[in-house]
């Protein structure tokens, strides 16, 4: 039965295990929600605004089905966009987006209809009636979200995180420090960003010393607002020792507008990653490394719509073990590190790294891998090579608030099924299985990030 009680559960032990974890609170240490939207607590106007307006997963699949861009990110009305989505939605079968959006519809709206061209109008009208009462804060409480960490630039004032402490009841909203723009000396707009950091924190950031002072002040500012983790997007990690004088010379050259060599770019990035590690060591923050996303690969899309519009891809040819060796040994036992990889063929590398370094944790299946298929493969491999018990937990990685419940439910069902299979095969006693799924679903990630 579609999305029935046994959805994704193929054995009796799995059903029993899922029933024990399905109602646990959600702790999400990595997502892309905007704290401002949660604090302002305005209801959505329509189902497209909820499900399609910010979701590049939806945009990509609509494009794959031949839908014109004006019905995706263009000037058409939200209703026209929803109808265009519903028309092609049956083609999404097998992709987790098909299940997530149906789960949202069934669990949150209690509308048990299959999305199609025939049902699109009814769903539009029924959700329209219910949305005025479904404010962001109410939904977060209904989904039992206990803690969530947004992703924020070091220049941020964190004004809405501060307001959330008083305005948002029952949910803790924390920032995550994401200093990618500080490190990416080769990107357009780097100097303007560095100047902005100087203005924000009262430092002369034309010099490396001033820029590092500004970053330290930002780090402290985030700490004061409850931050527990940093996050770093690395296409290919390449961290090694770089003398501070070398980094200082590169910084000044880049700030003056001179073109850098590739070696200078690499040296600057390596130096900055080590500085970020030192900052996190001071505050005992978790360092999250998201590895292997080749961003803005489709040029026309990036030029038209900018980043995060559905033009990013996964790439295989990365030297992760070599590139992280210095960083991991420099902070061996000193820094909690979580590794996420986009290409599943890199899972053996990060799993064995975690096995070698007790302070390193394998992150949840990420992005293109957070489907039932990808999660099952990830969990089974991790259990066989490292410790499933030590998985860093589920993250939604979502820009869409409504998907917290559906993404977490899917993960907990797959986890319960994987562990349930082990019970059925006689590999694990039921008592240990119950403790394992509870730990991975809630206790473990809460202790790692927030303990």
Curated annotation (Swiss-Prot):
InterPro entries cross-referenced by the UniProt entry: Metal_Hydrolase (IPR032466), Uronate_isomerase (IPR003766)
Transmembrane helix among keywords: no
Keywords on record: Isomerase
Residue pairs linked by disulfide bridges in the UniProt entry: none
Substrates-to-products reaction catalysed: D-glucuronate = D-fructuronate; aldehydo-D-galacturonate = keto-D-tagaturonate
GO molecular function: glucuronate isomerase activity
Pathway: Carbohydrate metabolism; pentose and glucuronate interconversion
Protein name, per record: Uronate isomerase
